[in-house]
Amino acid sequence: MSAKSIELTSGKGGLPVVKVRTPWSEAEIYLNGAHVTHFQKSGEPPLIFVSAKSQFAAGKAIRGGVPICFPWFGNRAGEPSHGFARTAAWQLVKSAVAPDGEVTLRFALPQLPGREAWSCLRTEFSVTVSETLTLGLTTANDSCDSAIEIENCLHTYFNVGDIGAVSLTGLQGTAFLDNAAGGNGARKIQEAAALRIPRETNRIYLDTISAVEIRDESLKRIIRVEKTGSHSTVVWNPWTTQKLPNDFDPAEHQRMVCVESGNVGPNKLSLAPGKSATLQVAVSSRAG
């Protein structure tokens, strides 16, 4: 590894973290969950939000950043929410620095005790840091006897100045499942060109490959989320009404919004033997 560009060190809670510096930006990725917790371009506020109350402990989920939801999304009886990948100890298997200073890291999800049903899958996560943050989650059915169903999602928490001054575009005309309190999972259509967040919001947008832009009037910034290999977009803000663990201060809802890219619910994937699927997300920003 280049000592100047990539450093594997001890982070919060004593957890191993990879710190990255490029000519344009800096980033941090914890091996616990292969969890991106920081991405900041020079001269800008951070693009990624992490709760001040988040736990940093082995085997515990980090509140904020980019949790990897896999191999399922949401709740499953008797199982951890959003799957086991986000709390597993991933392995850093490759790092590279391009001539221009761009950094690429590759992480592998190891075989885990008690997860033998998933052992025929191979899952890797790549992080490329430059002026843009590019993330890639690849799952291959290397040795399963038959097709296996999975859900995947990069559950990105974005840092905003004031949620009341934020609007999201790119979802007009798209069907979504309303999972907020009182929504009862009803299927609805996004009618407005711009989505505002004035209350608890939990929507799974279906059959969409569109980019989403987050216009932040407070920070005078536009964050663009582009994706490939994804047919679902999730927009989430818990407001003060959704009950969460004590790793999130309800007041923090003012400074974050999740725009998540993946394949969940009706858009879940079926991987036949010998097939693979890659979910890729590119995050960029500009003044606006």
Label every PLM stretch briefly.
Residues 145-149, 157-232:
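Active-site/ligand-binding surface loops and adjacent short beta/alpha elements
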Residues 29, 137-144, 285:
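Asparagine-centered strand-capping/turn motif at beta-strand->loop junctions
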Residues 58, 124-126, 266-271:
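Beta-strand-rich interaction surfaces with strong enrichment in secreted/lumenal proteins
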Residues 255-265:
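Short, structured beta-strand/loop micro-motifs enriched in basic residues and often containing a Trp
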Residues 38-40, 145-152:
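Short, hydrophobic/aromatic beta-strand segments
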Residues 80-130:
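Extended, loop-rich substrate-binding clefts of extracytoplasmic carbohydrate-active enzymes
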Residues 69, 216-257:
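Glycine-rich active-site loops that engage anionic ligands at enzyme catalytic sites
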Residues 1-63, 210-230, 273-288:
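Beta-strand-rich N-terminal accessory domains
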